[in-house]
Structure formats: structure tokens, C-alpha cells
Amino acid sequence: PLIPVAGKPIIGYILDQLVESGIEEFVFILGYLGEKIKEFLEDSYPKIKKQYVIQSEREGLGQAIYLCGEFIKDDSEVLIQLGDTILDIDIQVFMHSKYNTLAIRKVQDPREFGVVELDEQGIVRRLVEKPQIPVSNLAIVGLYLVKEWPKLIHCLETNIKTGRKTKG
């Protein structure tokens, strides 16, 4: 997130886009370099409402999202964006989807990404994490709109309690 692009950290571009889209509340998941990220956010974005969650053990994206549960109301729609990718997307259009939504992009070598397999209507049939034999070339790019937050938290809690993981 702190890697500079044209003199500005990646997370700065991401936050500028989200703030311009009208998002007012943020929960940041901190792990490696967490204090430096927090310092950057406090110095560069003092006016946004923010909470911090510490992910002390790197147990994956699902666990990181689960840790945010205490800060998010059950009736909330939640936009999740990973902090290491700048996207050229209209966040407002994305947020107005009536469905749970994730952003995807065609890539040359899908083995380096989580990918989606779509049905005939363009609905996600399944997600496959870094497949050796790709089911598609549609990579998940780290932007998710969750319309049913309580269901997601319940599923993540079940996965964590049963030790279900995609890798490791």
C-alpha cells in the first residue's frame, strides 16, 4: 500500500477515489508495516472517519474481513478494496449494483490470481484461487461489494472455526 506511484503511495490513490465517490467511513486492516500505514493515513487523511484492525497473523483475506465485523453494522452494505491495486473503475456505478458484486479483469496468465468461472448469464459460478489449470482468464482484482454482510460474516466464522482454507 505504501509503494509510491508517481510520488504518491498506492493507498493514497485508492483513498482519493473512494472519498471522491462519497464513502465516508473506513476500516483499515493492518499487518506488515501497519504502524507506517497508520501514520500515513493519520497525516494524509485526518478528516476521514477511520477504524483500525490488527491482523497479527497472516491468515488470509477471509480472516482479515472477519476481524472487521465488530466495526460494521449488520444492515450495512460493505465495499471491500484491497490496498495494493489501483483500479480504473467508476466506484459509484459499482456500488449501485443490486447484487453482491466483485470486480474482475481479463489477464494473460490467470495462474497468478484468483479467478472466476461464470455461467451463461454472467453470474459467478465459482471462485478458484491461483489455479494450476485455469478455469478462465477472469482475475479477481480485489474489489468487492457485499450486500449481505451478516451472511458473509457467518460463513467466514464457520470457515475459521472449522479450519477451512484455500491454501496452507
Stretch-by-stretch model annotation:
Residues 61, 111-115:
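Glycine-rich phosphate-binding loop of ATP-grasp-fold ATP-dependent ligases
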Residues 95, 123-168:
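Catalytic-core segments of class I nucleotidyltransferases/pyrophosphorylases
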Residues 3-4, 8-81, 86, 91-92:
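Conserved N-terminal catalytic core of the sugar/cofactor nucleotidyltransferase
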Residues 4, 117, 145-147:
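Short, well-ordered beta-strand micro-motif
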Residues 102, 115, 143-145:
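Conserved hydrophobic/aromatic beta-strand scaffold that supports enzyme active sites
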Residues 89-112:
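Conserved donor-nucleotide/metal-binding helix-loop-beta segment in metal-dependent transferases, i.e.
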Residues 117-123:
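Short acidic-glycine loop/turn motifs at beta-strand connectors
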Residues 81-84, 105, 146:
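Active-site flanking residues adjacent to catalytic metal/cofactor-binding acidic residues
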